Amino acid sequence: MQSTQGIERSGEHGRVIVAAVRIRGLVDVSPEVNHTLNLLRLRRRFTCSVYVLSDSIKGMLKSVESWATWGELSRDTLIQLLRRRGRIVGDLPLTDEYLKKYGWGSVEELVDAYLKGEVKSLWCRRGEGPRMINGKASCIPGLKPFFRLHPPKGGFKGSIKKPYGAGGELGYRGLDINDLILRMI
């Protein structure tokens, strides 16, 4: 099984962004694991959430490694994820026109600011509005904090009951998460 020690390195722009994808379903989940999956916003199969890596997130991901997979997200994959699967309230797609209302020129500009740490979170918490900093919103109101994905094209390469390092699909997979997400978009 691969160690999670490799995720300590700094990201391309200074922050390490991880994506978590729930692989297994809803049956036979212990209450503790189910609670952690809910906190990670992985409430159903093939949903994806994006986080800035911290010790608490790392511990939560470690506790759900039998139900989900995760790894470092690249800039290009995050852009594709927001463009093709990003949704706002009302299940409308996230567009550049919507971002322009909040001062952002494009998804690429928002992602670059997020990776550099200029934007703390991509979405606003419920009941919170964005703070305007230099004419740009600190978060995008109405953006859903999870992404609904398809099953991967071509299927899974391994068993969904084994860890990634043992020929399966679960647990930490490093940069290979980008390939999986692109197949699921």
From Swiss-Prot:
It comes from the Archaea. CDD domains: Ribosomal_L7_archeal_euk. Keywords: Ribonucleoprotein, Ribosomal protein. One of its GO terms (cellular component) is cytosolic large ribosomal subunit. InterPro entries: Ribo_uL30_ferredoxin-like_sf (IPR036919), Ribosomal_uL30 (IPR039699), Ribosomal_uL30_arc (IPR005997), Ribosomal_uL30_euk_arc (IPR035808), Ribosomal_uL30_ferredoxin-like (IPR016082). Pfam families: Ribosomal_L30 (PF00327). One of its GO terms (biological process) is translation. GO terms for molecular function: RNA binding; structural constituent of ribosome. Part of the 50S ribosomal subunit. HAMAP family: Ribosomal_uL30_A. Belongs to the universal ribosomal protein uL30 family. This is Large ribosomal subunit protein uL30. It comes from Caldivirga maquilingensis (strain ATCC 700844 / DSM 13496 / JCM 10307 / IC-167).
